[in-house]
A protein has these predicted regions:
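N-terminal secretory signal peptides and thylakoid transit peptides that target proteins
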Residues: 2-18
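Hydrophobic, aromatic-rich cap/lid helix
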Residues: 217-246
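Flexible "cap/lid" loop of the alpha/beta hydrolase fold
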Residues: 138, 149-191
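Active-site loop/oxyanion-hole signature of alpha/beta-hydrolase fold enzymes
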Residues: 44, 52-54, 88-132, 136, ...
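Conserved loop-alpha-helix segment in the C-terminal half of the alpha/beta-hydrolase fold
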Residues: 254-291
Length: 312
């Protein structure tokens, strides 16, 4: 498959082509749901974070992506809690966590994860991040190193979202950049403007394969709206301007890198990441098996098997 680079026009076309979203149904429940517990952790700056947990054994802590929720890991909670202690965290402002007006920066979210691991007294943790959750992990590593961690699972996040116009094609490919500065500001302004809902529907709706059922896609979009759009825009801007290419090669614990051939995140950037982390494992899902940005939902059985084998 040729390398994938989205232009500013591609991004704006996705944003502008949202389908009409009906009232979203409840989450499509996994066939065998685990007994899930709910809990609250208060961060060092007083914000109440909600989390879902199930199972017993070695801990697997999962960090959702930008504007995503812990509930979107429902298939992992159901499938992996039979073997592991699975914890999914709603980051500040996201999901069921407290809505506050500060802290929507990757560095603060990394500190929040650090707070969660300490408050729940978790050790030997496999830390899994999806999308922006990977950036949170990279920031955690930059600040705390391997503290309380044993393994990492990095799911579908490029090292740097926003391209420098002076980059060579190879630099752009390896970074995985899909925006330029003008497109980033345009997206920010749309998320803070009167068309914020339509913008979200188009942007997030374009992250799945065509095979994803409409009700599941609509539910994902409704989960996104749990983070107020102003905070979503602020966080996206901070996220999109972080360059992790100097941090990734310093990761020294076993790491699984997961990408998708049909994802908006260029799969070639996942190859670059895997090459920077010595001994890492790379898995790239094909489009016909649900290999877009939400492969952990669209191809949850295969995803869970790969993660379980990696942790074991």
């Amino acid at each position: 498959m040729p390398e994938q680079h989205l232009t500013r026009r591609d991004i704006l076309a996705a944003v502008g082509s949202a389908a009409v979203i009906a009232t979203a149904p409840n989450a499509v429940s996994p066939a065998h749901a685990a007994d899930t517990e709910g809990g609250t952790v208060t961060t060092s700056d007083g914000v109440k974070l909600k989390h879902m947990a199930a199972g017993a054994g070695r801990p697997l802590v999962m960090i959702p992506g930008w504007s995503q929720t812990a509930a979107q890991f429902k298939y992992q909670i159901a499938g992996l809690a039979q073997t592991y202690r699975v914890v999914a965290v709603d980051m500040r402002g996201h999901g069921e966590s407290q809505k506050v007006n500060h802290g929507y920066k990757i560095s603060r979210l990394a500190k929040d994860v650090h707070d969660v691991l300490h408050k729940l007294d978790l050790h030997d943790v496999t830390l899994l991040g999806h999308s922006m959750g990977c950036s949170v992990i990279w920031c955690y590593w930059d600040m705390y190193g391997p503290e309380r961690l044993s393994k990492l699972v990095l799911v579908d996040q490029m090292p740097f979202i926003t391209a420098n116009p002076t980059w060579s094609p190879d630099e752009k490919r390896d970074a995985g950049a899909i925006l330029d500065a003008a497109a980033l500001y345009d997206l920010y302004n749309r998320l803070t403007g009167p068309d914020a809902a339509k913008t979200t529907e188009g942007f997030v709706g374009g992250m799945a394969t065509k095979a994803m059922p409409a009700d599941q896609k609509n539910w994902i979009i409704q989960q996104n709206f749990k983070l107020p759009r102003r905070h979503a825009a602020d966080l996206l801007y901070n996220h999109a301007t972080q360059d992790w290419r100097d941090v990734i090669p310093r990761i020294k614990i076993p790491t699984l890198v997961v990408g998708g051939k049909a994802s908006l995140v260029p799969w070639t950037s996942q190859v670059w990441i895997s090459k920077q982390i010595k001994g890492s494992r790379l898995e790239v899902f094909e489009e016909n098996e649900g290999g877009a940005h939400f492969m952990f939902m669209e191809a949850h059985d295969k995803f869970n098997r790969i993660v379980s084998e990696f942790i074991a």
